[in-house]
Amino acid sequence: IVKRGVTELITPGVSLNDGVLNSKTNNFLAAVYFGAHTGVSFLDVSTGEFLTAQGSTAYVSKLLQNFRPSEVLIEKQKRQQFSTAFGDNFNTFYLEDWVFQQGYTNESLCQHFKTKSLKGFGVDGLPNGLIASGAILHYLGETQHHKLKHITSIERLLESDFVWMDKFTIRNLELYHSNNSNAVTLIQVIDKTLSPMGGRLLKRWLALPLKSVAAIKARHDVVQYFYLNETALMEIQSSLKGVGDLERLISKVATAKVSPREVVQLKNSIEQILPLSLIHISEPTRLVSI
């Protein structure tokens, strides 16, 4: 006798299916909470990235335009407010208002991370952002996504760290999309990355230009190093060609959705990490985020 029951609900924001996901694009599930400050949170369940922020409606609008979530969770009674503030171009799902109670969401987050508070993550000053984050965890439970050990931290997005572009700027610059079907976007021109992780990181960097001169210079220094050391560049590129999508493979292991073929891919990818780690040990400046 086979026990029947709902084992998983697939929605746009929680898919782990490679046939649905774009390897070089994050698949974010977002939640928005309206309060004195608008809270917002983004989770890519396929990679484990968990981000939160709060601020003005204009700031949250820019975040939504830059992260382009596949699905947005909001309170049932705030449908019209969301539509007025952010438009109707998002896939939305409405949750009961009690899900967005601060006590409930904080408890959900602390239980998930197995901590007594969230101070260690540097997000305790974002109460409305954390309400949105807790609502995301609730939704994952509702859709039968209970194995989430790969989500190990939550990070804050600081408005002061980046240049934030509105939807009109993003559209006019044709960063990743164009209304002209024959047009070539900026990301298509500059993306020469060899790994899916690198492709997603490049897209993130393009969406969130840095303000800090020191941080910009640090990136330039890495580029200069590889420009002047072609042998090192080719050595790393050779290793990267054998690396699969480690972030998503590890997430599939954590969620018990990995296939035998993907286990082999993970093994082969890990074997390529050793040469990279040796490069890192011998010359730290030669290894960048990939």
Model-based region annotation:
Residues 1-225, 234, 238-241, 245-254, ...:
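Charged catalytic and DNA/RNA-contacting regions of genome-maintenance
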